[in-house]
Amino acid sequence: MVSGYAEILKHSLILDRKFFLWLIKNGKKIINEKNKALLINAIFKSCKIKSTVVCKDEKERNLRMILNFGHTFAHGFEGAKNFSKKLNHGEAVLLGMIVAIDLSNKKKLLSFKEVSLIKKHYKNLKLLTNIKKFFKKNEINKIVNFMKKDKKNVSNKINLILLKKIGQTTKPEQIALKDIEIKKFLNSYYP
């Protein structure tokens, strides 16, 4: 259920603040499958958001790229773990979104208040927030090397979708960082 919830949460964070606030209220029942009606409603809303995006940009040339929020980091995390069961895709996406949220704040795009609200939701649902739980500092190069292989990168820079606020992302290709910048940022998790 965690993997599915990662995608539901992602859709709320990138395009629908009201949906995110609804998830704050109902997320625990959804993730624990305590209320089937809420689960169905969340899946329906999530699919509707994704469908709207895909229909507007079938070739993934612009808007559809926002669906990659958290995934560039996630692919780096999965690759660094050799795509093993130690970190499944949903967990990697949850962790990737948290790292992207922290970077959004560091780049002064996303307020501390919004970051706190998102992290509180993660904590209430016992979702992954700690990169150090899965990776040692010496694995950062491996993570970034996998991130560099992403097909959406431009001009030898890692293309990222970040949050400006809950329900709104940066424009596709607005944030493209050199691998050294990503390494420096990831190193900041290890004092």
Predicted regions and their residues:
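Short glycine/serine- and small hydrophobic-enriched flexible loop segments
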Residues: 7, 79, 98-106
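Small-residue-rich helix-loop
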Residues: 90-99
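Catalytic Zn2+-binding segment of zinc metalloproteases
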Residues: 76-85
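Residue-level recognition of alpha-helical structural elements
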Residues: 35-39, 62, 86-89, 111-114
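C-terminal charged capping/lid subdomain of soluble metabolic enzymes
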Residues: 109-191
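Carboxylate- and glycine-rich phosphate/diphosphate-binding segment that chelates Mg2+/Mn2+
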Residues: 1-67
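Active-site His/Glu-centered metal-binding helix of metallohydrolases
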Residues: 69, 73-77
